[in-house]
UniProtKB/Swiss-Prot annotation:
The keyword Phosphoprotein does not apply. It is an enzyme of class 3 (hydrolase). This is Uracil-DNA glycosylase. It comes from Pseudomonas savastanoi pv. phaseolicola (strain 1448A / Race 6) (Pseudomonas syringae pv. phaseolicola (strain 1448A / Race 6)). It catalyses: Hydrolyzes single-stranded DNA or mismatched double-stranded DNA and polynucleotides, releasing free uracil. GO terms for cellular component: cytoplasm. Belongs to the uracil-DNA glycosylase (UDG) superfamily. UNG family. Keywords: Cytoplasm, DNA damage, DNA repair, Hydrolase. The lineage of its organism: Bacteria, Pseudomonadati, Pseudomonadota, Gammaproteobacteria, Pseudomonadales.
Length: 230
């Protein structure tokens, strides 16, 4: 992971984050990942998809930011977009609750899959704060350096343009609120959509409709939260 041409990273993101690739923490993170691979550990998502959130949603296209924590750690799940899984994989419980809220809020039919790629393509930055994980070992790469990189991503997005929507669900996502200029953006918070907490305030939060209303009020095309049938 360097800022040279070996890294597939969308050009505007690459320029905006160039200095981060030269930071000492990034060298340490590269070495950690190298050692994990050398030890035969299976790392998710696959290398080409680590930066999928950035490549799918160029900086100039960002309208909404949804923060997750770390990638799913089961086979064929993670593909670099938070809360999303690859087509053909069962929809995870938190995403089931996201779909329930979409149905309640906007009467959107619950899709038959868990792939949120169409949201990313429209300008929803689906960013995990840790971008890799070891198979079957949740949060195994937390604290290894990714948090510095993704904190900078959040800051860059906040600084880059006004009138974005940040959806911060759960304590971990809300801990990043300090990185966002709330005078320029709409910040919406609630409990996490996990089955452990969704019924304590996630279901009924109205975030998707409120996000679109804010975008429209500021002359920005809203998100079509409907997902295509796969």
């Amino acid at each position: 992971m360097t800022s040279d041409d070996r890294i597939k990273l969308e050009p505007i993101w690459k320029e905006a984050l160039r200095d981060e690739f030269e930071q000492p923490y990034m060298a340490q993170l590269r070495e950690f990942l190298r050692q994990e691979h050398a030890a035969g550990k299976e790392i998710y998502p696959p290398g080409p998809l680590i930066f999928n959130a950035l490549n799918s949603t160029p900086l100039n296209n960002v309208k909404v930011v949804i923060l997750g924590q770390d990638p799913y750690h089961g086979p064929n799940q993670a593909h670099g977009l938070c809360f999303s899984v690859q087509p053909g994989v069962p929809t995870p419980p938190s995403l089931v609750n996201i779909y329930k809220e979409l149905k309640r809020d906007l009467n959107i039919d619950i899709p038959n899959h868990g792939c949120l790629q169409s949201w990313a393509d429209q300008g929803v930055l689906l960013l995990n704060t840790t971008l890799t994980v070891e198979r079957a070992n949740a949060a195994s790469h937390a604290g290894k350096g990714w948090q510095h990189f993704t904190d900078r991503i959040i800051q860059v997005v906040s600084e880059h343009q006004p009138h974005l929507v940040f959806l911060l669900w759960g304590a971990h996502a809300q801990s990043k609120q300090k990185l966002v200029d709330a005078t320029k953006h709409l910040v919406l918070t609630s409990v996490h959509p996990s089955p452990l907490s969704a019924y304590k305030g996630f279901l009924g939060n109205g975030h998707f409709g409120r996000a679109n209303k804010y975008l429209e009020q500021n002359g920005i095309e809203p998100i079509d939260w409907r997902l295509p049938v796969l």
